[in-house]
Design a protein with these regions (language model features):
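N-terminal Rossmann-like dinucleotide-binding module
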Residues: 1-47, 62, 281
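Beta-loop-alpha module in the N-terminal Rossmann-like domain of NAD(P)-dependent dehydrogenases
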Residues: 17, 47, 51-108
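C-terminal helix-rich "cap/oligomerization" subdomain common to oxidoreductases
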Residues: 66-69, 207, 278-310
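A contiguous active-site-proximal alpha/beta segment in oxidoreductase catalytic domains
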Residues: 74, 96-154
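Hydrophobic residues in well-ordered beta-strands that form the structural core
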Residues: 91-92, 116-118, 238
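Mid-domain beta-loop-alpha active-site segment that forms a flexible
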Residues: 119-126, 152-183, 276, 296
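C-terminal glycine/acidic-rich active-site capping loop/insertion
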Residues: 121, 230-295
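Contiguous beta-strand/loop segments that form the cofactor/metal-binding neighborhood of enzyme cores
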Residues: 167-244, 276-288
Length: 310
């Protein structure tokens, strides 16, 4: 069975999502909506058979199994609410800017028996799923500390760096450690030219007293996507920028305590967005959205709200 997809927003992220859905044998891009004629022409070039429009309401009552929303964050709530009345929805992160809106959308999805997905791409990566296994299996003893560095990204006008980059860190951490975290300290910076916070240092504590430091910044000469996990018996580096060796495990040498042994495990390096597409297909088939149950979206938003209000 092929699922019909409508994509709303074909600017920066919409084409990436569209490409991954079109690469699947189980989805077909039927509609692309965007307010830009240039973007619509690009979509028509990539998907000649799709219908294009500048009005998202034009696809109401069309046979659409999944609506993909990749627009400005402030518009997510309104568009998502409109479509959850009759079909399933995938929204680019962050879902909304308030937990109240997220809760309302989650309840609407339940009421109408529709599935609501959010594009937190890294929780579908082979690297994060490998990390989940070693944490659950207690492979290297107790996990004590995590340091995450996520720097350099296109500067956004609709949200600040916490809601842009920090949402990745919080989604990964909540996926790995559970939803509860306590905000300890936040330092935020705003350059004179930018009206929004562009750099943030975030200190959190998760259950079992796991201490977390996050640095998010748009302002960086190099792109950094690095998370360090400090276990009792090892330090694990997760470098999303490394094309092949995304996970490196360092353990102290038994013969020389000033040296480390390094192990590089075999990791699935399939593009996370394609794994997201596979997950959505399975969820639609089973009519169950397992990862996003138990308030996963809501708890991420609540944490981001706490950080923003600090």
């Amino acid at each position: 069975m092929k699922y019909n997809v409508a994509v709303i927003g074909y600017g920066y992220w919409g084409p990436k999502l569209s490409r991954n859905f079109s690469n699947s044998n189980n989805f077909e891009i039927k509609h692309v909506i965007d307010i830009s004629t240039i973007n619509l022409n690009k979509a028509k070039k990539n998907f000649p058979l799709c219908k294009i429009s500048k009005n998202y309401k034009s696809i109401f009552n069309q046979k659409v199994d999944l609506v993909v929303i990749s627009t400005t964050t402030i518009s997510h709530y309104k568009i998502c609410k409109f479509f959850l009345k009759y079909t399933n929805v995938l929204v680019e992160k962050p879902l909304c800017l308030t937990s109240k809106q997220v809760f309302e959308l989650e309840e609407l999805a339940k009421k109408n028996k529709k599935l609501l997905f959010v594009d937190y791409p890294f929780i579908f990566s082979g690297s994060v799923n490998y990390l989940s296994k070693i944490i659950k299996n207690n492979s290297f003893g107790k996990l004590n500390e995590i340091e995450s560095f996520r720097e350099q990204a296109p500067i956004r006008k609709d949200v600040n760096v916490i809601w842009d980059l920090g949402v990745h860190d919080i989604s990964i951490l909540n996926f790995l450690l559970g939803d509860y975290s306590n905000v300890v300290n936040i330092i935020k910076y705003k350059t004179k030219k930018l009206k929004k916070i562009d750099t943030a240092y975030i200190n959190l504590i998760y259950k079992n007293n796991i201490k977390v430091l996050i640095k998010n910044s748009w302002i960086s000469p190099i792109k950094i996507r690095l998370i360090k996990f400090k276990f009792e018996n090892a330090i694990v580096y997760y470098d999303e920028n490394d094309p092949l060796y995304k996970i490196k495990i360092y353990t102290l040498s038994k013969t020389n305590k000033s040296l480390f042994n390094i192990k590089i495990p075999e990791i699935d390096i399939t593009e996370p967005l394609f794994r997201l597409v596979e997950y959505i297909e399975k969820s639609l088939n089973k009519k169950r959205n397992k990862i996003f149950e138990n308030n996963f979206n809501l708890n991420i938003t609540k944490t981001l709200e706490k950080i923003s209000k600090w």
